[in-house]
Amino acid sequence: MKPFHWSSEKNESLSADRGISFETVTVAIGAGGLLDILAHPNQRQYPRQRILVVAVDGYVYLVPFVEEDDYLFLKTIIPSRKATREYLRRGEADAED
């Protein structure tokens, strides 16, 4: 996977507002927390964006990114209850079967 880049101002804002940083997400990805890579659902408005689905401490975050030639530029971090149910709870249900 290509290296990650991001806006330091956005990272500070995310840390203050949401309690999670791009560093935390990249560490989780390195530790095997990358669950999926999705196409952005609004391709008309965001034609070059895709979304990393990342598990961090038992919760799933959606991380939109733009792929450049040499790196992935991370845009923001969105906590997702729906993705947590779909990705983590599904795994628990599969383990019980």
Language-model region placement:
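Ribonuclease/tRNase effector modules and their secretory precursors
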Residues: 1-97
